């Protein structure tokens, strides 16, 4: 007591030193060792091994358990003869490189026996008191095609240098990984295929948690047939993975930022499923580019200098008394990691630190004669301006916007009900600002937003006047970029849902404006009507049986015969038909064509590539009294239909 009374400062110092030392004693220093084949990083909580030949994560141990599906030798070491790192077309999924541990689809090896990767220590724990270790496995393309994983040819797939990093910090329950891609100016044209990090997990993982509606017991013998029923919106699930009901441990991939992920806030993707080979290992997947649901792309022209850093993201391992507790902890950890972003330990000129980034804010003001009130689910983003994608010998241009872009970075935020928004941690660059919200057809754009390091931007009030082609006569649905509001959309994961349409609507859909309810009377898939009692669903392929043409009939009343031009406007969020015919009162009025196929129906989705289409017709086709408008999907395989987000009829009588 006398010490505290007379020397309060010394007392404070004493306890600060005591608790600091106590904390240090709880968290051992990070160590880094190596042999001919691997680096081993250890912090007393986790031990990870990285293959020098490829950058594959061949082992991750936690609580003295191997967390990956790694084949082990009798002394519990990774069996790298049975499952060699890098290019390995003779693995369990034959014909492509696919391992039973953690790996990037585009590793640093490239085709086997072409050129060795360069392994190095980029952060040496001996030089920082054991606070952090980092290793690099770098592959120099020199014109080679790199990447031999799923979707790639055995001779490689993408011409780029690849630098794969793993970083382990003191006291961290997991390891970070990231990959730096660089296409040098002297390299030829190249096109990226499926691109992701995959972690295949130990057999004791039996509970998958990738979304609040997809959080369930998933043992090895639970054969779901089709992994596409487990796709989810990436941006809504930044922490996802598996836990074990027998070992009470978890493994989760945590994205602290979505800036390096393709497709923006509406992108649907695989996050987890069981492998399709006989081992059926639990998989956690971090796709940053894929072909799923319309996909995204990275095409790089000959002579183009392109660079991108994917990550760092965190491979988090934890424990708890139940899967729900383990999942809750992982989601809480995601918030912590997001607050840390960008990580100050990343030393790369192409990875701006916090002081080198900026904030962009503003307020959207909606000017619309019908839509009033607060913004609902307002999303605002800064992305690359729309661009022409490089193609070899292309007859037409392919323009890429944020939905299909994986080449550049994107920054999105959820705005407030009053239209205000703030996008933080933005890299320097030139961007287009996009915004969309529930209840409003279309999206807002503002071009030429130039972000400079450390210089906040206040865009002030931004007036948004949605496009209208005339007076609104009626509408169906809610413009929200998906079909969630329509009948049976909540059952999209039922692989046979397309077949059930014919039973639910034997006479097809008839929708009466002012009386019908789209949540009960509008089936969310407009598909060919099945007439084959033997028709069946096939995993990964959907339903190939041919159905007859299907009319959706909309009945509506008009007080007088109209004049002028009518515009039938569509927001489309899933397409696999070639066209949709439009009839008004039994007469042809036009056709929806030039559609964007995205496989949403065969892959059990309710949203893919979103776009607008319209059909203009002479208003004289309509009359006083009751009118009939038909949308007709042609005879075709039952997969070949349409999913609407929203439909609106407008009349310009000027």
Spans of model-derived segments:
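Beta-strand-rich N-terminal accessory domains
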Residues: 26-93
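A contiguous, surface-exposed recognition patch within enzymatic or periplasmic domains that forms
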Residues: 197-308
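Structured interaction patches on ligand/partner-binding surfaces of diverse proteins
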Residues: 438-461, 465-467
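Beta-strand-rich ligand-recognition modules
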Residues: 415-418, 545-563, 571-653
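Extended, loop-rich substrate-binding clefts of extracytoplasmic carbohydrate-active enzymes
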Residues: 92-181
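A short, amphipathic beta-strand motif
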Residues: 358-369, 419, 462
């Amino acid at each position: 007591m006398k010490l505290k009374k007379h020397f309060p400062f010394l007392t404070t110092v004493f306890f600060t030193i005591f608790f600091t030392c106590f904390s240090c004693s709880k968290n051992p220093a990070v160590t880094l060792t190596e042999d001919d084949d691997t680096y081993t990083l250890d912090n007393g909580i986790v031990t990870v091994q990285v293959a020098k030949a490829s950058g594959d994560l061949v082992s991750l141990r936690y609580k003295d358990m191997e967390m990956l599906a790694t084949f082990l030798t009798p002394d519990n070491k990774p069996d790298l003869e049975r499952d060699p790192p890098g290019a390995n077309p003779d693995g369990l999924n034959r014909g492509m490189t696919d391992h039973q541990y953690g790996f990037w689809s585009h590793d640093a090896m490239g085709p086997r026996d072409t050129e060795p990767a360069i392994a190095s220590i980029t952060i040496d724990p001996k030089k920082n008191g054991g606070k952090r270790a980092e290793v690099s496995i770098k592959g120099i393309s020199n014109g080679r095609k790199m990447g031999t994983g799923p979707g790639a040819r055995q001779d490689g797939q993408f011409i780029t240098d690849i630098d794969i990093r793993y970083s382990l910090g003191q006291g961290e329950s997991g390891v970070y990984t990231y990959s730096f891609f660089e296409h040098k100016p002297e390299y030829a044209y190249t096109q990226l295929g499926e691109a992701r990090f995959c972690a295949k997990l130990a057999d004791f993982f039996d509970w998958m948690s990738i979304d609040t509606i997809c959080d369930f017991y998933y043992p090895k013998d639970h054969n779901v047939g089709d992994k596409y029923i487990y796709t989810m919106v990436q941006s809504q699930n930044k922490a996802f993975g598996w836990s074990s009901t027998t070992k009470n441990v978890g493994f989760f991939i945590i994205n602290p930022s979505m800036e390096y992920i393709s497709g923006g806030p509406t992108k649907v993707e695989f996050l987890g499923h069981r492998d399709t080979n006989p081992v059926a290992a639990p998989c956690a997947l971090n796709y940053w580019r894929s072909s799923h649901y319309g996909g995204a792309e990275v095409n790089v022209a000959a002579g183009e200098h392109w660079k991108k850093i994917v990550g760092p993201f965190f491979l988090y391992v934890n424990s708890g008394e139940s899967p729900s507790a383990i999942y809750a902890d992982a989601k809480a950890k995601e918030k912590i990691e997001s607050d840390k972003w960008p990580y100050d330990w990343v030393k790369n000129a192409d990875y701006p630190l916090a002081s080198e980034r900026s904030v962009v804010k503003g307020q959207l003001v909606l000017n619309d004669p019908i839509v009033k009130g607060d913004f609902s689910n307002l999303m605002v983003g800064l992305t690359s301006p729309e661009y022409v994608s490089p193609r070899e010998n292309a007859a037409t241009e392919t323009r890429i916007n944020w939905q299909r872009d994986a080449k550049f970075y994107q920054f999105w935020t959820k705005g407030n009900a009053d239209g205000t928004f703030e996008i933080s941690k933005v890299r320097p660059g030139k961007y287009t600002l996009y915004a969309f919200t529930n209840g409003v057809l279309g999206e807002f754009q503002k071009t030429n937003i130039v972000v400079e390091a450390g210089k906040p931007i206040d865009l002030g009030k931004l007036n948004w006047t949605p496009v209208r082609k005339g007076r609104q006569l009626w509408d169906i649905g809610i413009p929200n970029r998906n079909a969630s509001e329509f009948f049976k959309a909540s059952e999209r994961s039922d692989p046979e849902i397309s077949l059930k349409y014919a039973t639910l609507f034997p006479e097809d859909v008839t929708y009466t404006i002012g009386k019908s309810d789209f949540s009960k009377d509008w089936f969310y898939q407009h598909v060919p009507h099945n007439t084959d009692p033997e028709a069946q669903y096939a995993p990964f392929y959907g339903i190939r049986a041919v159905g007859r043409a299907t009319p959706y009939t909309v009945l509506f009343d008009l007080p007088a015969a109209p004049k002028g031009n009518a515009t039938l406007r569509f927001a489309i969020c899933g397409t696999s038909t070639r066209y949709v015919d439009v009839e008004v009162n039994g007469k042809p009025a036009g056709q929806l064509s030039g559609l964007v196929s995205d496989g949403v129906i065969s892959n059990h989705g309710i949203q893919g590539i979103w776009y607008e289409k319209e059909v203009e017709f002479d208003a004289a086709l309509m009359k006083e009294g009751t009118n009939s408008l038909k949308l007709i999907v042609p005879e075709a395989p039952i997969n070949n239909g349409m999913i609407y987000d929203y439909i609106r009829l407008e009349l310009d009588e000027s």
